[in-house]
Amino acid sequence: MILPDVNVLVYAFRRDIPQHAVCRRWLADVVESDARFGLSPAVLSAVVRITTNLRAFKMPSAVDEAFGFCEDLLCQPHCQIVEPGDRHWSIFKRLCVETDARGSRVTDAWFAALAIEWGCEWITFDRDFARFPGLKWQVPAARAEGQEN
């Protein structure tokens, strides 16, 4: 199962971002497929937070548009809500300790632990995720072209 990062969904939603076309096409392929895909509520809340932020965008998205984008994904029959389970904290702690995660990398470790716990492939443009042992991850375009990291 795949699990997209915040950046992938923000890029798919916002037409004014250079990676929009790649991410929109990738997301359309995911939605049109019958394969299960995961969504983290923490990722979706960050999508709403970022896309509606006047500091991030000269013309931020309306709150109802951002929620509509997220809800369109959540209502797909093959969408799986992915939340931390019993093993998440121990995986998260291990990743933080092993990689000396600090600051914003702690959040990255939290998401990496979520993907590892669920056995998901993390889809992101952030190559810093390569630092987390045991995490399977891909860049959207690379995944579409069959390349692996």
Segments predicted by a language model, with ranges:
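Acidic active-site catalytic centers that drive phospho-/nucleotidyl reactions
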Residues: 5, 108, 126
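Acidic, PIN/NYN-like endoribonuclease modules and their adjacent C-terminal/linker elements
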Residues: 112-149
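Active-site neighborhoods of divalent-metal-dependent phosphate/nucleic-acid chemistry enzymes
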Residues: 79-123
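Ligand-binding beta-strand-loop-alpha-helix segment within the catalytic cores
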Residues: 73
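Short, well-structured N-terminal submotif of metal-dependent ribonuclease cores
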Residues: 1-39, 54-68, 145-148
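Short beta-strand segments at enzyme active-site cores
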Residues: 38-41, 124-125
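Conserved beta-strand segments of alpha/beta enzyme cores
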Residues: 36, 78-80, 136
